[in-house]
Amino acid sequence: MPVLSEDSGLHETLALLTSQLRPDSNHREEMGFLRDVFSEKSLSYLMKIHEKLRYYERQSPTPVLHSAMALAEDVMEELQAASVHSDERELLQLLSTPHLRAVLMVHDTVAQKNFDPVLPPLPDNIDEDFEEESVKIVRLVKNKEPLGATIRRDEHSGAVVVARIMRGGAADRSGLVHVGDELREVNGIAVLHKRPDEISQILAQSQGSITLKIIPATQEEDRFKDSKVFMRALFHYDPREDRAIPCQEAGLPFQRRQVLEVVSQDDPTWWQAKRVGDTNLRAGLIPSKQFQERRLSYRRTTGTLPSPQNFKKPPYDQPCDKETCDCDGYFKGHYVAGLRRSFRLGCRERLGGSQEAKVPTGAESQVLLTYEEVARYQHQPGERPRLVVLIGSLGAHLHELKQRVVAEDPQQFAVAVPHTTRPRKSHERDGVEYHFVSKQAFEADVHHNKFLEHGEYKENLYGTSLEAIQAVMAKNKVCLVDVEPEALRHLRTPEFKPYVIFVKPAIQERRKTPPVSPDSEDIASSLDEQQQEMAASAAFIDQHYGHLIDTVLVRQDLQEPAASSELS
């Protein structure tokens, strides 16, 4: 085996060791790793630098002069005063060059060992267990968007700390700012003795890039977990009117029935969410489900939130003598045009006199409307179509709407055939216009909860059964069904996956024109009353059942026909 001399450098030693490595059956991978490491060019360069430094230490050169720059300046003064020979001019020009002057200045700095700034001495009473705070300089680039972080003053230490990181904001995208970090400076401005609102103003006025001096939190919280939960809002929310929100500017306003993507539930009181379909990728604060339920429960207990039974009864729910219907009419051999109105009239005949408003009662009335978890619906091949449920206020004329939809595309849409105890007429066919059944069979089906809803009109029973709806869906057609709003809870099942459409007529203010005759004045007055009843009916349904509605359809074309039919 070759023997190395004492003067052999580390580079030669490693090179010789590499050549002497022999593969071992037990350590073949380790030997290959060492051979690869020792063969790297970067390691070879480092070894050469190491040898040069060791050589410098052994030589230990000492500077001949500690002020070469001062000597050069003295020589330059002598040359300027001396005779002007070519050699003297050349030396003067050489000593005046910036590069040589810089070399001499570096020489003096090294000779004088002027390497580091002189730090003040440590105080005598320093705590031995004191740990130096690590300061982090963070530079963020943002346009006109907010920083995406909220701050607060710590009650115990008085420091300004990061309270919340908003998902999708500049701070979140950087990954350099965390909850609990202490903020010391913003763009060189100390913020320790400033109020949080003053600091927010400084941050808002900073455009382009912003530099933060931060002391990291002692225990950094984990990064946000990927949380994608979709919630449908069942109430309107405006953060500007919420005095409990930590930061109104960070709040996310939304309307009832909007779908929200909840991206963070770390805070049990305030969630972070985005509106689905919104181009703004930054999340905002919304009250959590638990917090909103507590708040609504408190308001209901203290009387600031009226319970559903306390709402004023709408005018449309009063008995109306002018409303008439011929339930014998039918829609092209498939559905009775006036069936929905016959149910209403039948209920009025049975109850008699004035009615109470059909508000939710029992456990349903005590439900606190906050959020409803939803999932994006994607129709799968071979899956039955969703059930389309129509509910309407006065003047909606749902039967005409269904007639128009089915007539335009009878291969895709259909309606459920209702049941009745009325005797069959000569032109009617069982299972087409109606399912004609006996009163005993009808009442038995009612007892077994086979009907979605049912009613009595002129001593005859009418009803829409769940089996009739299922029969339409089994044909791979979209079933259109109109029901009273209180029947919606029976249809909200995984089997039907109902899509609920609230249909209401357009209500427009009547132009104030002088009446031509007393008769025209009476007609105009009747129209105004009907418009008010329609508006009250729509408001009542939206107030009590709006959380069950998916979309609202305003019918512009049926306003005048509805008014004329009511007057006839």
Curated annotation (Swiss-Prot):
<dbReference type="Pfam" id="PF02828">
    <property type="entry name" value="L27"/>
</dbReference>
<dbReference type="InterPro" id="IPR050716">
    <property type="entry name" value="MAGUK"/>
</dbReference>
<dbReference type="GO" id="GO:0005912">
    <property type="term" value="C:adherens junction"/>
</dbReference>
<protein>
    <recommendedName>
        <fullName>MAGUK p55 subfamily member 3</fullName>
    </recommendedName>
</protein>
<dbReference type="InterPro" id="IPR036034">
    <property type="entry name" value="PDZ_sf"/>
</dbReference>
<keyword id="KW-1003">Cell membrane</keyword>
<keyword id="KW-0472">Membrane</keyword>
<feature type="domain" description="L27 1">
    <location>
        <begin position="6"/>
        <end position="60"/>
    </location>
</feature>
<dbReference type="InterPro" id="IPR004172">
    <property type="entry name" value="L27_dom"/>
</dbReference>
<dbReference type="InterPro" id="IPR008144">
    <property type="entry name" value="Guanylate_kin-like_dom"/>
</dbReference>
<dbReference type="Pfam" id="PF00595">
    <property type="entry name" value="PDZ"/>
</dbReference>
<feature type="domain" description="Guanylate kinase-like">
    <location>
        <begin position="385"/>
        <end position="568"/>
    </location>
</feature>
<dbReference type="InterPro" id="IPR036028">
    <property type="entry name" value="SH3-like_dom_sf"/>
</dbReference>
<keyword id="KW-0965">Cell junction</keyword>
<dbReference type="InterPro" id="IPR014775">
    <property type="entry name" value="L27_C"/>
</dbReference>
<feature type="domain" description="SH3">
    <location>
        <begin position="226"/>
        <end position="296"/>
    </location>
</feature>
<comment type="function">
    <text>Participates in cell spreading through the phosphoinositide-3-kinase (PI3K) pathway by connecting CADM1 to DLG1 and the regulatory subunit of phosphoinositide-3-kinase (PI3K). Stabilizes HTR2C at the plasma membrane and prevents its desensitization. May participates in the maintenance of adherens junctions.</text>
</comment>
<dbReference type="InterPro" id="IPR008145">
    <property type="entry name" value="GK/Ca_channel_bsu"/>
</dbReference>
<feature type="domain" description="PDZ">
    <location>
        <begin position="137"/>
        <end position="218"/>
    </location>
</feature>
<keyword id="KW-0728">SH3 domain</keyword>
<dbReference type="InterPro" id="IPR001478">
    <property type="entry name" value="PDZ"/>
</dbReference>
<dbReference type="InterPro" id="IPR027417">
    <property type="entry name" value="P-loop_NTPase"/>
</dbReference>
<feature type="modified residue" description="Phosphoserine">
    <location>
        <position position="307"/>
    </location>
</feature>
<dbReference type="Pfam" id="PF00625">
    <property type="entry name" value="Guanylate_kin"/>
</dbReference>
<dbReference type="GO" id="GO:0005886">
    <property type="term" value="C:plasma membrane"/>
</dbReference>
<dbReference type="GO" id="GO:0016324">
    <property type="term" value="C:apical plasma membrane"/>
</dbReference>
<keyword id="KW-0677">Repeat</keyword>
<comment type="similarity">
    <text>Belongs to the MAGUK family.</text>
</comment>
<feature type="domain" description="L27 2">
    <location>
        <begin position="61"/>
        <end position="118"/>
    </location>
</feature>
<comment type="subunit">
    <text>Interacts with HTR2C; this interaction stabilizes the receptor at the plasma membrane and prevents the desensitization of the HTR2C receptor-mediated calcium response. Interacts with HTR2A. Interacts with HTR4. Interacts (via PDZ domain) with CADM1 (via C-terminus)Interacts (via PDZ domain) with CADM1; this interaction connects CADM1 with DLG1. Interacts (via Guanylate kinase-like domain) with PALS1.</text>
</comment>
<keyword id="KW-0597">Phosphoprotein</keyword>
<dbReference type="InterPro" id="IPR020590">
    <property type="entry name" value="Guanylate_kinase_CS"/>
</dbReference>
<dbReference type="InterPro" id="IPR001452">
    <property type="entry name" value="SH3_domain"/>
</dbReference>
<dbReference type="InterPro" id="IPR035604">
    <property type="entry name" value="MPP3_SH3"/>
</dbReference>
<dbReference type="Pfam" id="PF07653">
    <property type="entry name" value="SH3_2"/>
</dbReference>
<dbReference type="InterPro" id="IPR036892">
    <property type="entry name" value="L27_dom_sf"/>
</dbReference>
